[in-house]
Amino acid sequence: MRKASIKRETKETQIELSLNLDGSGKYSIDTPVGFLNHMLETFSKHSLIDLEVLASGDVHVSHHHTVEDVGIVLGMAVKEALGDKKGIRRFGYAIVPMDEALSLCSIDISGRPLLFYDDLGLRGKITNFDFELMEEFFKGFTLYSGITVHLKALSGKNLHHIAESLTKSLAVALRQAIEIDPRRKDTPSTKGSL
């Protein structure tokens, strides 16, 4: 089984995260940021990655550190669980609607962490959650997972719907890319490694 458990503590956050890439989308999420919990549950459900997250942080200052650091730890765990990446499909893509919102995600598990992100330039709050923190979450995930991620909101007006559409599109694309291809016995690269 491709699993990982990461514990990361800083002066700003304390995070414990475990995942199973070969799961069924089971989750147990406990952070002090309600909307982040919702997005992590959505991510787990649609990627089929079993996910457990226990996090605390300096949310009296801002949600920023907790949201970004959970993204970082999730990226670290995905990278660790992928191991040598033998047999994976490597690429994944999805276009996912959430009511009026539509988002596209295309990923390459390349070992080259790059995020190309477009949220239509929208800003505002989802309850008490700053919408622009979605980019910080995705940036942390991308940099520490070693994955190239193109993530683009194509349309939408409701910030909750856009955030959820972005998260679901990443989850579905990642589900495809981490899947083991029974025909592939080696690492999916002409270089021989990723």
Curated annotation (Swiss-Prot):
CDD domains associated with the record: IGPD (cd07914)
GO cellular component assignments: cytoplasm
Entry-linked InterPro entries: IGPD_sf, ImidazoleglycerolP_deHydtase, Ribosomal_Su5_D2-typ_SF
Pfam families: IGPD
Coiled coil residues, start to end: none
Encoding gene, per UniProt annotation: hisB
Localisation per UniProt entry: Cytoplasm
GO molecular function: imidazoleglycerol-phosphate dehydratase activity
EC number: 4.2.1.19
UniProt-listed GO biological process terms: L-histidine biosynthetic process
Natural source organism: Persephonella marina (strain DSM 14350 / EX-H1)
Protein name as annotated: Imidazoleglycerol-phosphate dehydratase
Catalytic activity: D-erythro-1-(imidazol-4-yl)glycerol 3-phosphate = 3-(imidazol-4-yl)-2-oxopropyl phosphate + H2O
